[in-house]
Design a protein with these regions (language model features):
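A hydrophobic, multi-pass inner-membrane permease signature
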Residues: 1-223
Length: 223
């Protein structure tokens, strides 16, 4: 199975999309969550706007038209930027930031801290658990994504993620095996491909759980 260069290419592409999408989504969630948690005049409108997008989705065709208008079709960016975050993740991080004791923020403001210092030095250490929850969910969604690749980079096989190769191989297992060996087992190939696609994320899950448990119990001490 791993002698097929398409599987290796799929792994590399998927890792790129997972890392890029997760990091970009984490940054967007942190900044959006912080802004939404602050008491500003537009806070209510922005929260309502985020909630509205969770109930009404533009759909596949309008989304594709936007991606095409931005010139991202046929590129890796079409599989990294779209879907790296959503309104639910932003609201979760916002709620976590809003629960930080205001006395910490007031103490930082008295010491002359700006928004970036408050966000990363005061709020982030106490809310990293929830932020990591959104990051892990983003990573899992990026790892399992194949439909986006099938419409954004259908002819650019060098950009195909692992899951799209898995779909192609399992759907055409008979032809794939006939080309490789005359003594083939279609079911065995399908099982092997599925295990190869899911094993990495399953092995990483216990590590993520430990990080989440540690992050959830973090607190703060004013100094």
């Amino acid at each position: 199975l791993f002698q097929d260069s398409s599987i290796i290419s799929g792994y590399v592409n998927t890792i790129i999309y997972v890392i890029g999408g997760t990091l970009l989504g984490l940054v967007m969630n942190i900044f959006a969550g912080y802004i939404l948690s602050r008491a500003t005049k537009l806070r209510g409108f922005m929260i309502l706007y985020c909630v509205f997008t969770t109930m009404f989705n533009g759909g596949t065709v309008p989304t594709y038209m936007v991606i095409r208008a931005l010139g991202m079709t046929g590129t890796r960016w079409s599989l990294i930027i779209p879907g790296c975050t959503n309104a639910v993740f932003m609201l979760l991080v916002m709620n976590s930031f809003a629960q930080v004791d205001k006395s910490y923020v007031e103490a930082a403001e008295i010491d002359g801290a700006g928004h970036l210092a408050i966000m990363f030095k005061v709020m982030w250490p106490q809310c990293k658990g929830m932020a990591l929850v959104t990051a892990i969910n983003t990573a899992i969604m990026k790892w399992n994504a194949w439909f986006e690749a099938s419409i954004y980079v259908p002819n650019n096989t060098e950009y195909w993620p692992l899951q799209l190769w898995v779909k192609k191989i399992t759907a055409n297992a008979t032809d794939y095996l006939k080309a490789a060996t005359p003594n083939y087992d279609k079911g065995l190939l399908q099982y092997c491909v599925i295990v190869a696609a899911t094993l990495p994320i399953l092995l990483a899950f216990p590590f993520f759980i430990k990080k989440l448990e540690k992050g959830m119990v973090l607190g703060g001490v004013k100094g």
